[in-house]
Amino acid sequence: MKKYIDEALYEYSKGEVYPFHMPGHKRSFCPETLKNPYEIDITEITGFDNLHHAEGILLEAQKRVAKLYHADKSFYLINGSTAGLLSAISACTSDGGSILMARNCHKAAYHAVYLRRLHAHYLYPAVFEETELNGGITPKAVEEALSVYPEIEAVLITSPSYDGMVSDIAAISEIVHAHQIPLIVDEAHGAHLRFSDTFPESALENGADIVIQSLHKTLPSLTQTALLHTQGSLVSEERLKRFLSIYQSSSPSYVFMSSMDACIRLLESSSEVLFKEYTVRLKECRRKLSELKYLHLVETDEVVGKNGVYDMDCSKIIISTKGTSIDGERLREKLLDKYQLEMEMTAPSYVLALSSVMDSEEGFARLADALLEIDSALDSEMENQMKEKAQTKIEFTDEDAICTIAETMDAEWEEVNLKEAEGRVSTEFAYLYPPGIPCIVPGEMVTKELIEKIESWKMQGLEVQGLIDYHAQKIRVQKR
């Protein structure tokens, strides 16, 4: 029987699956004024302003955002943090210029590099052997790169990372500003940070010039809603506004903007109480999970001060399966099939549960009880060879880059079998999504290690995206 999207969603919403994934409203926050979105879905009619030339109600709404977040200026993003990244990078660089960016940046950053025909230089986070999580970016690495590449026009860091790892933004911003260039921080996963001392400080509090946040990821706002904040004088507001108009829809959704405003109003009036109660629930859940015997809750003190990690966002609940008889994908399946708990992300050796201020006491209890029950049935036997192979890591290096992303993507290509592509120059991205961090970008050479990694991901049942071939059996490479 044919099933339509709206019917499928409605049916799903009536089920028992609990969301430990974004959006941050967790399907439990709906202001009275938003209960019927069709009633408020309008265009730029009299009295309702224009996002691309805000002078009235939308300008005032964005001013309230700036006041709440202590920014000089704040902008609504109705095309998500993707639009913010595209706009920020474009505003801070010249066509054909250079950017220094963390390798674990979101794919939207790479799209900006392509569109602006930039030369990208990468900062590589170290990997924690115990958990296979990416670490942070060190101030020393930033300083060294800026010394080697004085032509760099902007620096882009992701902090917190998808897994909650926070870099030393205060030290990095000081270094970047000494070179008279702006620091852009992709804080898509950190819109909630400033509302509780339980969490790390926001990049806005530590000197970043542009900070991009996804409201919908960790706060009660609709999917696709985000914010861009600016401070200081290193970024041209005129250029930024120009690119925001280019990358954002000319028909911005008033439903989305109403959702953002409702979220901001809630934070203005009740953030102190809401976050106090939330952090109590979160800490109790983490306390229970600290009793796991075989599975392992990744704790803040395990990562902070190591591999470039300055702090960790403990709202991200990371459960490591390393050294047990279960892998990340099988744990995710058990949590969903038996306990009706949907995780945010799975990796070969861990799962990530994303919590938010809207998570209930019951939800946290269900997660803790389920993991403790699964844990009690496990043993600590080492995994078989397939599991060990799946956990082989790739160490990214600059030597694999042959030419720029734009040069490669605009060149002639041919499609070859992935297993026969060693030594060829890729014209495609390849990444696991989530979190969307590329293991190869156009212009880089396909290595034996990369091929083995992709094959192992496929064996684990993980989805490799970015390649035109959805099955990741073929890859497009530069034509000889």
Enumerate the language-model features and the residues they cover.
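Conserved PLP-enzyme active-site core in the AAT-like
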Residues: I5-Y10, E32, S81-D301
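Short, glycine-/Ser/Thr-/acidic-enriched flexible segments
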Residues: R27, Y162, K217-T218, S233-V235, ...
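Charge-dense polyanion-binding interfaces
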Residues: E463-R480
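Short glycine-rich or small-residue beta-strand-to-loop segments that form or flank ligand, phosphate
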Residues: F75-L77, V155-T158, I318, L352-S356
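Conserved N-terminal alpha-helix of the aminotransferase class I/II PLP-enzyme fold
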Residues: Y38-G80
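N-terminal "arm"/small-domain region of PLP-dependent enzymes with the aminotransferase-like
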Residues: M1-G56
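Conserved C-terminal alpha-helix-loop-beta "cap" of PLP-dependent enzymes
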Residues: E284-G466
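Structural signal for conserved beta-strand scaffold positions within catalytic alpha/beta enzyme cores
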Residues: Y76, Y122-Y124, Q213, M345, ...
